């Protein structure tokens, strides 16, 4: 039985994907920070605030004692706050956001590296808004996602035994959008966009589609997906044409100024 560790399994994407993995026969291990999720009863869930080193060490130590070796790591951790123009934000909160959205996720993965199951393991992270344009008033969130994209490429380049890639799920109905509603006018144009989306019957990207994209990325191996950033909504993942293009262009779907 393959084992997946989901960081932030209490998040909507984390819990829904967790259940999909369980239904496909995976053993799911998850972490949460505040409230333990009740909608994924078959998962082994541990309280772990990834911004606290002691929590990380305790979590990793528990897995080690239970002789658990992971095959896949998926991080669903994230916050879009603080939402405001950069110089109007409280910088301490801004710094904490970068820590949650970027540094702390890498710290957990750094600790977990030695507990991998073998030579073919996968790490999947989540990209977000601002990859292709300014994400006005969401600077901490945006810069963290860009950093994660580059980190995927760096890990892929340094560790041939890992298939590390990142996906942008697109507009999905999750609790994260409530942070934008809370911010109100500070969110700028995105406030009305999110408000309209939440009131509509449109569910956005389905969790099933996000799941299928991840499975595709794992199956295709690092030569195709390693170090790259994929859009669940806009990219033609799953097609042979894209596979051939990726194999022939090592710079495709990565952060590049070249050819721009």
At which residue positions do the language-model features occur?
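C-terminal helical subdomain
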Residues: 166, 186-259
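A short, exposed helix-loop element centered on a Lys and neighboring polar residues
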Residues: 109-110, 153
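N-terminal Rossmann NAD(P)H-binding glycine-rich loop of SDR-like oxidoreductase domains
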Residues: 10, 14, 18
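Rossmann-fold cofactor-recognition segment
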Residues: 41-54
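Structural signature of the Rossmann-like NAD(P)-dependent dehydrogenase/reductase core
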Residues: 6-7, 75-78, 121-128, 163-168, ...
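Conserved mid-core segment of classical short-chain dehydrogenase/reductases
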Residues: 57, 78-95, 137
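Catalytic loop of short-chain dehydrogenase/reductase
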Residues: 122-160, 168-174, 178-184
């Amino acid at each position: 039985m393959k084992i997946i560790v989901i960081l932030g399994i209490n998040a909507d994407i984390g819990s829904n994907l967790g259940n999909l993995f369980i239904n496909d026969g995976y053993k799911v291990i998850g972490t949460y920070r505040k409230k333990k999720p009740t909608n994924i009863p078959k998962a082994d869930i541990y309280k772990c605030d990834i911004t606290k080193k002691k929590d990380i060490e305790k979590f990793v130590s528990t897995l080690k004692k239970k002789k658990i070796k992971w095959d896949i790591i998926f991080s669903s951790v994230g916050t879009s706050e603080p939402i405001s123009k950069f110089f109007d934000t409280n910088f301490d909160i801004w710094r904490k956001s970068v820590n949650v959205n970027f540094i702390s996720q890498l710290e957990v993965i750094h600790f977990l590296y030695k507990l991998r199951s073998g030579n073919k393991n996968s790490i999947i992270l989540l990209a977000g808004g601002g990859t292709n344009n300014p994400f006005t008033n969401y600077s901490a969130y945006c810069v963290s996602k860009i950093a994660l994209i580059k980190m995927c490429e760096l890990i892929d380049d340094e560790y041939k035994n890992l298939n590390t890639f990142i996906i942008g799920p697109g507009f999905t109905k999750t609790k994260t959008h409530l942070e934008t509603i809370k911010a109100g006018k500070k969110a700028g144009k995105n406030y009305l966009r999110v408000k309209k989306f939440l009131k509509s019957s449109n569910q956005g990207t389905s969790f099933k589609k996000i799941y299928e994209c991840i499975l595709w990325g794992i199956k295709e191996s690092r030569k195709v997906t390693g170090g790259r950033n994929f859009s669940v909504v806009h990219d033609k993942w799953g097609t042979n044409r894209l596979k051939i293009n990726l194999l022939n262009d090592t710079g495709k779907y990565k952060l590049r100024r070249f050819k721009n």
